[in-house]
């Protein structure tokens, strides 16, 4: 290769690196307004009952691609469940969940240990009034012990939905009106159970942090001790919330690709508020974030069509 060719090749590589760095710098800022263009996913409208609507959304500025499922749990044809893998390694793809559980809509659920086989759930997993995994009661940060009651999503058999800061004791669940007042380098002194009330749900899972509370954006990532982790950063995302009408909102945002960068927690909260939620919670994200409708993957998890196997999921079934 001649000296001129080497210089041209080096200049081209340098230009590409500069473009990538500039693009990342431009896209890493947090947006306070996210104007989405939403439309009904047409090929789902004829097969699903009136209580289930599937939408796709686009914002060119960030940019992001997103999918939302709006579910009316009062529809007698609709059932909401939190489900757990029954495979030997305790993980399945959402398509497998969809087929095994006869679910029409499935999104990924809570955090799990990817480097352990069989895997274990990170935090509460409560299915059919039975504790599969207990709540995370404390975590270590910089050799300091932080007590925590992290955000949880709960379903009741009557179709009601709740999002709360939750802990567990044996097979009993308890929720707090406010999160524990943790701050980076400043943990709460103790875990005060006297401030907790029984939480009456049939299915529940820990994830977090909470994104919205009482109709307002309130991202409690520090209180739930997610500082010192990558969770607050820009990622592909899955979130769940509910409207004042009681409708469940499930949202998946693609990320880690040129056409869809992903969102941070504040941006995710904005999207959920714009979808009409009064309460909302962040679920497991990254390569786990996916939505399957009638066995078909709608999004591109972390830029691919390969589904990550997960331990828990939220399933919408039709009677």
Predicted regions and their residues:
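Bacterial Sec-dependent N-terminal signal peptides
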Residues: 1-32
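Short glycine-rich loop/turn motifs
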Residues: 63-68, 150, 206-208, 235-239, ...
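Flexible, D/E/H-enriched segments
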Residues: 29-56, 219, 296-319
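Zymogen propeptides
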Residues: 26-171
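Short, conserved active-site entrance elements at the starts or edges of catalytic domains
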Residues: 184-191, 199-227
């Amino acid at each position: 290769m001649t000296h001129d060719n080497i210089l041209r090749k080096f200049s081209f590589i340098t230009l590409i690196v500069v473009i990538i760095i500039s693009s990342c710098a431009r896209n890493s800022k947090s947006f306070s307004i996210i104007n989405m263009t939403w439309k009904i996913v047409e090929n789902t409208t004829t097969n699903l009952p009136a209580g289930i609507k599937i939408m796709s959304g686009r914002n060119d500025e960030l940019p992001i691609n997103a999918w939302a499922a709006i579910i009316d749990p009062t529809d007698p044809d609709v059932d909401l469940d939190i489900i757990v893998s029954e495979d030997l390694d305790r993980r399945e793809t959402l398509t497998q969940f969809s087929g095994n559980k006869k679910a029409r809509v499935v999104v990924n659920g809570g955090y799990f240990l990817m480097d352990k086989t069989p895997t274990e759930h990170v935090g509460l997993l409560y299915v059919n009034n039975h504790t599969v995994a207990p709540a995370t009661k404390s975590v270590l940060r910089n050799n300091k012990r932080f007590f925590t009651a992290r955000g949880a999503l709960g379903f009741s058999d009557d179709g009601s939905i709740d999002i709360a800061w939750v802990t567990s004791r044996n097979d009993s669940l308890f929720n707090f009106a406010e999160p524990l007042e943790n701050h980076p380098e400043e943990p709460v002194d103790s875990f005060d159970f006297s401030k907790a009330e029984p939480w009456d749900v049939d299915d529940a899972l820990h994830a977090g942090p909470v994104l919205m509370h009482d109709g307002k954006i309130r991202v409690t990532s520090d209180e739930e001790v997610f500082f010192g982790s990558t969770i607050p950063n820009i990622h592909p995302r899955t979130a769940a919330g509910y409207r004042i009408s009681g409708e469940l909102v499930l949202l998946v945002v693609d990320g880690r690709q040129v056409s869809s960068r992903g969102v941070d927690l504040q941006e995710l909260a904005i999207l959920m508020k714009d979808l009409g939620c009064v309460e909302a919670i962040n679920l497991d994200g990254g390569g786990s974030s996916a939505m399957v409708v009638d066995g078909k993957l709608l999004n591109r998890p972390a830029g691919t069509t390969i589904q990550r196997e997960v331990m828990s999921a939220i399933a919408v079934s039709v009677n």
